[in-house]
Amino acid sequence: DEGYKQFLNRLWLPLKERLPVNQKVLDFGCGPGPLLANMMQDEGMDVSVFDHFYHPDQSVLRANYYDAITATELIEHLHQPKQAFKLWLTMLKLNGDLAVMTKRVTSREAFAKWHYKNDLTHVCFFSEACFIWLAQMHQLSYEFIGNDVAIFHKT
């Protein structure tokens, strides 16, 4: 689906600029059809996939192994995002990138009218300030791309 590919490119294209070919990348929460993983493989990346429901192979959850980890439209579904964030950082090598895609809360007023919160599978929400706090807590640099992508860099 070309539209979904363009959607995923909002995360993939800026991440790809940071990665040499043949880097180890984990697509965490890839869902039943790992389109992003396929896109990354097509660009020469060494990609593993993990999804709690569709690709539950725990052997890919390796410490200090990945050059990049992607989590697209996932973190808002997690009941314990703090644990997931810590796991991602454990699996990420030094100088690795964690790319997260989720709509961000912009204000309390906007939240009240926000369609995104009405999806009952969305159980937690993040603002730019929250992501900045996470980056500072874990001594990460960060970059926001558009209104739904954050890339954290582990140094």
Q: Predicted segment positions?
A:
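Short conserved AdoMet
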Residues: 20, 79, 93-94
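Residue-level detector of anion-binding/catalytic polar loops
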Residues: 46, 97, 141
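Short "lid" loop at the C-terminus of a central beta-strand within the Rossmann-like core
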Residues: 54, 103-108, 124
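Conserved beta-strand signature within the Rossmann-like core of class I S-adenosyl-L-methionine
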Residues: 95-104
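A short, conserved alpha-helix within the catalytic core of class I
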Residues: 78-88, 102
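Conserved N-terminal segment of class I S-adenosyl-L-methionine
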Residues: 1-68, 85, 101, 118-119, ...
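A short SAM/SAH-binding and catalytic strip from SAM-dependent methyltransferases
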Residues: 68-81
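Short glycine/proline- and charge-enriched loop/turn segments
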Residues: 111-119
